[in-house]
């Protein structure tokens, strides 16, 4: 008699789900008793189960591992539908095919407005894990981020907007694509961010004659301390499928070995009282994340910790008077940390934050040399491109 592994798997998981439900009910019996008197049985039940379900981490691990055993490359996920796993073990979010026309028009109008104020503008396209010529076809079948980015950049180029496509430089320089991204997270590694920081400064100097770091001192990796921490990081994707399926990533911490001094302000709350100050480590690095033994701690956020709505970073030891406004997503956290070492002021704005920053006022008051928008290929939505042109 031939054993059907799929039927056995289904039966086992029905038994496990029943057991988990029973244990959760018993562990939260007091909450359920109170819920019966609350008048909102359905919502309260959902809340209790979602917040207190027994063995949740173990269940995620077991379910994902079972899918791997049954040769599934699309791992179930409640929020995204599927998490994609390629043959190299990399995990990916899916990304929809987006009509980027209106987003490109917003960006073109934003660039025109800045030009009228004699402020330079460039759109910088950060890569996504779905890399041309490297990623398995199954990823491109479910992730349209590169297609969206290609169409977006094409419209900008046709309208004379300055762009820097880091994806093309990865191909041109034949970088080791195994080391560009974390396997378990959607972000680039710190070493990739450092490379991108170098390319960005080169571009700014060549395109706008800013003369940033003319001696290449602050961009020389030999002037930084690198500390590699082995198997310490379970990223955003790995947390969704379980570490038994994804494994753990190594993390490389990079910080200057030269003298630094900063004053950092939260532009939303106070532009006069710094929230952080001191050298690079004291002002920018978050030891609670860096030294945490919890593998789910977000190592990517070791620099700055949060995606602040408006963060003003002043380097008191640099006197080149270069001021840059960086409109960003979370990819920019490590890159911005490195960029801050070689310019007088770097302001970071994240349009996802609420209350939303008044960009027009910030630009009018800021006296910026350059405004940059630096996004990865998966953020083509109205929020990220809502520049509020007036």
Region annotations inferred by a language model:
Residues 1-390:
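Extracellular glycan-modifying ectodomains
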């Amino acid at each position: 008699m031939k054993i059907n592994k799929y039927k056995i798997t289904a039966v086992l998981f029905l038994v496990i789900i029943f057991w988990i439900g029973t244990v959760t009910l018993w562990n939260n019996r007091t909450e359920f008793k109170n819920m019966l008197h609350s008048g909102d049985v359905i919502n309260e039940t959902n809340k209790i189960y979602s917040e207190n379900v027994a063995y949740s981490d173990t269940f995620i691990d077991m379910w994902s591992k079972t899918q791997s055993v049954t040769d599934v490359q699309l791992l179930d996920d409640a929020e995204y539908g599927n998490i994609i796993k390629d043959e190299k073990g990399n995990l990916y979010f899916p990304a929809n095919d987006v009509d980027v026309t209106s987003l490109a028009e917003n960006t073109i109008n934003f660039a025109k407005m800045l030009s009228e104020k004699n402020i330079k503008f460039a759109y910088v396209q950060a890569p996504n894990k779905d890399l041309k010529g490297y990623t398995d076809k199954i990823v491109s079948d479910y992730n349209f981020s590169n297609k969206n980015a290609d169409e977006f950049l094409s419209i900008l180029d046709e309208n004379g907007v300055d762009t820097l496509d880091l994806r093309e430089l990865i191909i041109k320089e034949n970088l080791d694509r195994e080391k560009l991204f974390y396997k378990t997270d959607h972000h680039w590694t710190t070493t990739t961010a450092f490379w991108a920081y170098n390319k960005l400064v080169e571009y700014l100097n060549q395109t706008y004659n800013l003369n940033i770091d003319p001696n290449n001192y602050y961009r020389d990796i030999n002037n930084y301390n690198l500390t590699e921490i082995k198997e310490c990081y379970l990223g955003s994707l790995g947390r969704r499928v379980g570490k038994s399926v994804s494994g753990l990533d190594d993390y490389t911490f990079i910080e200057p070995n030269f003298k630094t001094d900063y004053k950092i302000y939260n532009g939303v709350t106070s532009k006069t009282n710094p929230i952080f100050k001191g050298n690079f480590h004291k002002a920018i690095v978050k030891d609670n994340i860096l030294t945490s033994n919890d593998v789910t701690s977000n190592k990517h956020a070791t620099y700055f910790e949060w995606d602040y709505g408006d963060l003003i970073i002043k380097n008191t030891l640099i006197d080149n008077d270069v001021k840059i406004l960086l409109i960003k997503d979370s990819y920019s956290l490590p890159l911005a940390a490195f960029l801050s070492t070689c310019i007088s002021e770097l302001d970071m704005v994240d349009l996802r934050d609420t209350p939303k920053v008044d960009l027009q006022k910030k630009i009018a008051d800021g006296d910026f040399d350059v405004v940059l928008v630096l996004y990865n290929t998966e953020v083509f939505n109205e929020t990220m491109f809502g520049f509020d042109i007036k």
